[in-house]
Structure formats: C-alpha cells, structure tokens
Amino acid sequence: CSLPVLATFHRKLRAEVPLQNRLEDNDRAPWLLARRLLAESYQQQFQESGT
C-alpha cells in the first residue's frame, strides 16, 4: 500500500467521521464506510498518477 493512498484515505475518513452517528444502527456501517473510502482513495491516486 502506498503512502499517498493512505494519506488520502485518512483525510477522507476524518471528513466522514460525523456520519458514523447516523449509521450506528448498522453494525457493519463503519466497515463499509472505511472500505468505500479506501477504494475512493485508491481510485483518486491512480487518476492523479495517470494524468
């Protein structure tokens, strides 16, 4: 895993943390959120590298 991807993931995760309160009824919600944000971080990194 590359450091820029993790930095992007961390930034996105911190931006999304307030959403956790609205998703507490779903035990899997934090994992699904983290998985989505990590995927977006990878995608963003590859888009930046490709341009």
UniProtKB/Swiss-Prot annotation:
Keywords: Nitrogen fixation
Gene Ontology BP, a term: nitrogen fixation
Function, in words: May protect the nitrogenase Fe-Mo protein from oxidative damage.
The protein's assembly and partners: Homotrimer; associates with NifD.
Family per record: Belongs to the NifW family.
Protein name: Nitrogenase-stabilizing/protective protein NifW
Upper taxonomic lineage: Bacteria, Pseudomonadati, Pseudomonadota, Gammaproteobacteria, Enterobacterales
